[in-house]
Amino acid sequence: LPQWDPSQEEPDTYNLPDMQLTVSKFISDIMATIKSQEDAKSYDFLTGLPMRNLGERLTAEFMQTHDGCLVFLDMDNLKKINDIYGHKAGDRALKCLGKLLQKRADQGISCRLGGDEFLMFLSDTDPDSLSLQMDDLFQKFHNITTDDPELRFATLSAGLCLCSTDDSFEDCYSKADKALYYVKQNGKNQFFFYQQIDRSTLAASGSGKDLKLVAESLQKSGILSLIHI
């Protein structure tokens, strides 16, 4: 019978170390793809900013070690733009604002909460410096919208709350939201610090709005011919 001669055996075409590297790279590529897809779900495709869940988490974590200012930012009249010029115009306005906020990444964190609402945390506690930053943001957005006839109704409103590391994210969020509400009820297209508004003023602002809505409803129904608010 013929004897097996190892020297005559064809060389192994499979190199185990190379195969291990190939498998390792394949798995690495798969994991990178999955992570990329997960990251994509956390970012708004229009503005490129983190969406609510990621943005709020990053902001809350950052606030634990940094004093600063939480800003609740709202784009005014987005619905009006969508209704008159279509959603492409509204999306264009959102993209413009997103780009402006991305350019300020060195100043803090920004995210899109949804719709026309955005959240920012600026690592600055000086009201004068913060006011200059907000003025600059408002002016740059105004310059963009005035150059585009379809975006001429778009303006910004913002509520600001000065925060320290001792403050909770939830408390500052609520205060910034109240400051934004005050702005919305007093003409829009401006910003206010929560610390500038006392509780009685905030309460009066809300009550006044409610009374005005009731009066308008009564006038339309014909129950009252004239009501002065």
Please give the residue ranges for each predicted region.
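Active-site core of bacterial EAL-family cyclic-dinucleotide phosphodiesterase domains
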Residues: 206-228
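Signal-transducing coiled-coil linker helices
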Residues: 5-45, 52-67
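PAS-family sensory domain
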Residues: 68, 108, 156, 189, ...
